[in-house]
Amino acid sequence: MGCTLSAEDKAAVERSKMIDRNLREDGEKAAKEVKLLLLGAGESGKSTIVKQMKIIHEDGYSEDECKQYKVVVYSNTIQSIIAIIRAMGRLKIDFGEAARADDARQLFVLAGSAEEGVMTPELAGVIKRLWRDGGVQACFSRSREYQLNDSASYYLNDLDRISQSNYIPTQQDVLRTRVKTTGIVETHFTFKDLYFKMFDVGGQRSERKKWIHCFEGVTAIIFCVALSDYDLVLAEDEEMNRMHESMKLFDSICNNKWFTETSIILFLNKKDLFEEKIKRSPLTICYPEYTGSNTYEEAAAYIQCQFEDLNRRKDTKEIYTHFTCATDTKNVQFVFDAVTDVIIKNNLKECGLY
């Protein structure tokens, strides 16, 4: 006699099939979802990488979004010129022309309007005269001795354009803005049939305790290092060299037991600034034992080795290193394409398909 299923049994089989199908779909979805954690010390370029993802994968910033950055551009410009003027007092540098002392006093009186997104012709004139001054330029050339925004010269050299009443920030202006990241900023985008979730975590020391719950199930970590930080100290601790701080943090991330299976991608960032700086500021400031030349290639390769040598699992764990300029969209696009290929390859390995 043939075996027939009762209605109840049939329903159970259908339920089982549906569960299997859902599990398979969930598995496929999980395989296509990529969680990227952006880590690195403060001001290493993490937030700029996030902005680039919006430009490359999400059609960039709309005109309305760009307009909202106007106040940040003005604030960054004002903060930069004020930082230089204050440093002149500390470094005992005089103005090239005595009349600039009056401009400096005016700057502090007029600065408030820029914080509201307005750059008056009077304020723009004051900043232009100060920026052209020989003493101000001498102080700017010693910016490693105090804290100064990387984009200072970018904005100050372009005051004629950004002080126009009808000024709307460009994509590049937006990329150059500096706002301290607090907490966790999450960005989503699709690329090469993968769904990316990127988490940008505040880099300053006070923010690091908030990172912990981001770590679980992460596909890859992109660790950003500012190459140009080799001769700078931390904003939070003037005794600590920024590059040494980055190495300490990278060591703790790279060798963490939670990240045994996690791909570690190292972005040695701000290569453009490093290439300029290494000509006049020797690498021995950071690495006294360094005996190589102060050429970009040799000095950059030495820093790369310092970081890669921190990996205590060389036999089983590879560090994928890229030299980047986070403000250069084409460079970031090229590098991120290579990063995605590594992620796809590693995903296939886990599935036994590579």
Curated annotation (Swiss-Prot):
It is a lipid-anchor. The modification ADP-ribosylcysteine is found at C351. PROSITE patterns: G_ALPHA. Mg(2+) binds at S47, T181. Keywords: ADP-ribosylation, Cell cycle, Cell division, Cell membrane, Cytoplasm, Cytoskeleton, Disease variant, GTP-binding, Lipoprotein, Magnesium, Membrane, Metal-binding, Myristate, Nucleotide-binding, Palmitate, Transducer. Changing L249V: No effect on binding to PLCD4. Changing L37A: No effect on binding to PLCD4. Residues 324-329 are annotated as: G5 motif. GDP binds at residues 43-48, 151, 175-178, 269-270, 272, 325-326. The keyword Lipoprotein applies. GO terms for cellular component: centriolar satellite; centrosome; ciliary basal body; cytoplasm; cytosol; extracellular exosome; Golgi apparatus; heterotrimeric G-protein complex. GO terms for biological process: adenylate cyclase-inhibiting G protein-coupled receptor signaling pathway; adenylate cyclase-modulating G protein-coupled receptor signaling pathway; cell division; GTP metabolic process; negative regulation of adenylate cyclase activity; positive regulation of macroautophagy. Changing N256A: Decreased affinity for PLCD4. Changing L39A: Decreased affinity for PLCD4. Residues 35-48 are annotated as: G1 motif. GTP binds at residues 42-48, 150-151, 175-181, 201, 203, 269-270, 272-273, 325-327. A lipid is attached at C3 (S-palmitoyl cysteine). Changing W258F: Increased affinity for PLCD4. No effect on binding to CCDC88C. Residues 196-205 are annotated as: G3 motif. (Microbial infection) Deamidated at Gln-204 by Photorhabdus asymbiotica toxin PAU_02230, blocking GTP hydrolysis of heterotrimeric GNAQ or GNA11 and G-alphai (GNAI1, GNAI2 or GNAI3) proteins, thereby activating RhoA. This is Guanine nucleotide-binding protein G(i) subunit alpha-3. It comes from Homo sapiens (Human). The gene is GNAI3.
